[in-house]
Amino acid sequence: MNQDQDPIVIVSAARTPMGAFQGELKGFAAPQLGAAAIRAAVERAKISPAEVNEVIMGCVLPAGQGQAPARQAALGAGLPLATGCTTINKMCGSGMKAAMFAHDLLLSGSSEVIVAGGMESMTNAPYLLPKARAGLRMGHGQVLDHMFYDGLEDAYDKGRLMGTFAEDTAAKYQFSRQAQDEFTVQSLKRAQAANKQGLFAWEIAPMAIKVGKEEKFVEMDEQPFKANLEKISTLKPAFRKDGTVTAANSSSISDGAAALVLMRRSAAEKRGLAPIATVVGHATHSQEPAWFTTAPVGALTKLFERTGWNAKQVDLYEINEAFAVVTMAAMKEHGLPHNKVNVHGGACALGHPIGASGARIVVTLIGALRKYGLKRGVASLCIGGGEATAMALELP
C-alpha cells in the first residue's frame, strides 16, 4: 500500500530536558541522553522493546563517545541485541533526517517499527590534537575544540563562525538589533511560561542526577531560567564589532536528546495503538553554504509543493532558532505570523544541542498542536553547509 492508503504515523515522542552548557546534564554522555529519550519513547508507545527493528539517531559531535553512539543509546535504553542501529550526521538537521530516513524505510517495507531521533552533549565534546599521530617534532602545536571545529565553524571558509553568516542575513533583511532582541525576549518568555505552566510535561522525560548525596530529578529546561531579560539589550555583538547578533539572539550551547517511535498506520492498528501524528511529507533543500540561514525558506517551499498545503493552512510551525534571524527570515519570506511560530519558545531560549534539535522540534510541535487542539504542523531547521530540512505533520 502507498503513503495515502497506509501512511507513516508517530505513536509516541519523548525528549530530555534541555541542559545548559556545563549544566545539570553535564554528567551524561550523548548516548546516555539518547538512551533516556529512547527508553521513554518506547515505554510511552506501549510496545515491547523487542518490537523495535531499527534505531536511527543523529549525533554531530561523536569524537570521544566510543563506537556507534546510536547502538550505545539503543542498548542503554534496554532494546535487544537484535535491534539494528545507525548514527547519522547531518549537522543541525540530524535528528529530523533520522525521522525522514525512518519514514522512507517504513514506506519501503524494510522495517516495521523504528525509533528515530537525535542526541548531543556539547558539554562533553573533547579537544582535538592535530598532527599528534605523526609527531609534532618540535615547536608549538595546536589544540582544536571539537564542538567549534565540527559544529560551529564553516567547513568551506575555515575558522569562520556560523554567527558571521547570521550577520550577513541580518544585513540582507535589514533586521535591526532591536528586532532580533525583541524576538529573543518573546522566545524566552514563551519558554519560561511553558516550563512553569507544565506545558512541556507531556514531552519531557525527567532525568535523575546526583546533587551531593541526594538524587534530584531534572524536569524542566535549564537555559531559559539562566537568562536575564533586562541585560539582553546591553550585550555586545558576538561576531562582528559593529554587528547585531549577540549571544542572546543566537541559540544556546546545550545538551539533550529526543526520540520518536514510527510505524505504518496498519502496524499501529494491529497493535491497538492510537497514533499521535501522521507524517504527511518531508523535504530537503540545499543551496550556497554561506546562506544556510535562509535554506529553511526553500525547504518550506518544497514541502508545500509536495503536500499541497500553503503557508496559511498550517496551524503551527517550529522553525529552529539557530539564530533569531533564521526564523525571522523564514517568517518574512512565507508571511508567517509570530503567534504561529515557536509558540513555546525556541532555541534562543531552550538551547540547541545540534544533533538533537531536529527531533526536539518535532516532539515540541506535536505537543503544542495537542495542547491547543490544532491539526497541521510544520517543523524546519537550517543546517550548516547550506541545507535545510522540513517535515509536515497532521494530528488525528
Where would I find each of the regions flagged by the language model?
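Active-site pocket-lining segment
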Residues: 165-167, 210, 280-349
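N-terminal extracellular/periplasmic Venus flytrap/periplasmic-binding protein-like
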Residues: 9, 14-16, 27-35, 44, ...
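Condensing-enzyme catalytic core mediating Claisen C-C bond formation in acyl metabolism
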Residues: 1-28, 40, 229-294, 298, ...
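Conserved active-site "lid/cap" helical segment
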Residues: 2-65, 69-77, 81-84, 168-177, ...
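Active-site-proximal alpha-helical scaffold in enzymes
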Residues: 88-120, 170-199, 259-266, 331-332, ...
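Active-site nucleophile and cofactor-binding loops and adjacent substrate-binding regions
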Residues: 66, 85-94, 249-253, 292, ...
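Flexible glycine-/small-residue-enriched beta->alpha junction loops
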Residues: 113-169
